[in-house]
């Protein structure tokens, strides 16, 4: 991967990545390993995203011209009982980062968001232009992530409308990358299913929630590529092609693991589909998490990012085979 299309105004100032220890954060570290640009990765111990003073201290210390925010309060069910913390991390923290980029460093801001900003107002794939919410039908997590998106857009729109010469000359830009069903290096649905498949002879998996499984490695690559591009600011749906249910994903992952030599107890016919109502949880989950990726495809094609856009199945297959291979070696 190349960062050659991104013209850093001052290469002594590092790219700042928040969320070092998450699945996307770990993938970003791997992506940046071979790129000769200074990068600083921050975790919870380095910056408290619920504390504005802590964020500002880090921003003033490093003075970044590029921020990639892969951090979030993602404990969806816990957020129902901790709304203030969820909003601090998911709304106020990215607002502070966006203000710094738009008004002080005049650089690039990449922010990862979620399918949880939608509340089943469509039965087909959502476009970036579709109305989000309604807010009263979203989980606390969804509300806080949507509020973060809106805060970022407001900050950049106000900076642009101000007509400040440095903003216009230096092309401050933001990219909000909405995604869904992320998996990578860390705890996730696929790893849970593979573990349970080795322990049980029957599984019950929700079949009436539909979305797009997305590789954290691919998400990291897309985020870096967008930061290094000259494409238009805005929201982009960053998901592969295709769609499936949680049940469909479980079946595909387990069958792939079995073919790769992983010992599994459960047979495909014993992975039973159930409705989400049979598995009640504190926070609301969208039944429809489909998101159209056509806008992102067009942007990436203009950058010659890839000759072929990925399908979720090929990404999951590669992930499972790599995971099984690593497990067999250990």
Model region roles, listed by residue range:
Residues 52-91:
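NAD(P)H-binding glycine-rich loop region in Rossmannoid oxidoreductase-like domains
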Residues 222, 229-282, 324-329:
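Mid/C-terminal beta-alpha module of Rossmann-like enzyme folds, strongest
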Residues 33, 37-57:
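Adenosine-cofactor binding site in Rossmann-like domains, unifying the SAM/SAH pocket
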Residues 2-6, 309-330:
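Amphipathic terminal alpha-helices
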Residues 88, 93-96, 117-177:
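Catalytic helix-loop patch of NAD(P)-dependent Rossmann-fold dehydrogenases
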Residues 151-211, 217-218, 225:
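NAD(P)-dependent short-chain dehydrogenase/reductase
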Residues 6-31:
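N-terminal Rossmann NAD(P)H-binding glycine-rich loop of SDR-like oxidoreductase domains
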Residues 81-110:
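NAD(P)-cofactor binding segment of oxidoreductase domains
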């Amino acid at each position: 991967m190349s960062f050659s299309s991104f013209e850093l105004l001052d290469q002594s100032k590092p790219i700042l990545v928040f969320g070092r220890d998450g699945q996307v954060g770990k993938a970003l570290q791997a992506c940046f390993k071979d790129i000769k640009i200074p990068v600083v990765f921050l975790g919870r111990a380095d910056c408290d995203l619920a504390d504005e003073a802590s964020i500002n201290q880090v921003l003033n210390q490093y003075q970044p011209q590029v921020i990639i925010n892969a951090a979030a309060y993602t404990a969806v069910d816990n957020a129902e009982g901790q709304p203030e913390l969820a909003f601090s991390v998911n709304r106020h923290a990215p607002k502070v980062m966006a203000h710094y980029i738009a008004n002080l460093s005049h650089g690039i801001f990449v922010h990862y968001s979620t399918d949880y900003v939608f509340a089943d107002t469509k039965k087909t794939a959502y476009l970036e232009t579709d109305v989000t919410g309604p807010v009263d039908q979203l989980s606390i997590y969804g509300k806080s992530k949507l509020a973060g998106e809106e805060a970022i857009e407001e900050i950049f729109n106000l900076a642009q409308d101000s007509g400040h010469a440095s903003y216009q000359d230096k092309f401050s830009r933001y990219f909000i990358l909405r995604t869904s069903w992320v998996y990578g290096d860390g705890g996730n649905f696929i790893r849970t299913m593979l573990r349970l498949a080795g322990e049980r002879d029957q599984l019950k998996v929700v079949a009436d929630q539909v979305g797009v499984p997305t590789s954290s490695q691919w998400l990291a690559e897309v985020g870096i590529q967008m930061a290094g591009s000259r494409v238009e600011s805005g929201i982009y749906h960053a998901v592969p092609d295709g769609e499936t249910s949680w049940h469909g994903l479980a079946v595909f992952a387990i069958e792939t693991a079995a073919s790769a030599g992983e010992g599994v107890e459960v047979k495909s016919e014993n992975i039973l589909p159930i409705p989400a109502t049979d598995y009640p949880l504190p926070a609301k989950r969208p039944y429809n998490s489909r998101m159209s990726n056509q806008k992102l495809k067009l942007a990436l094609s203009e950058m010659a990012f890839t000759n072929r856009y990925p399908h979720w199945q090929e990404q999951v297959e590669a992930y499972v085979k790599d995971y099984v291979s690593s497990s067999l070696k250990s």
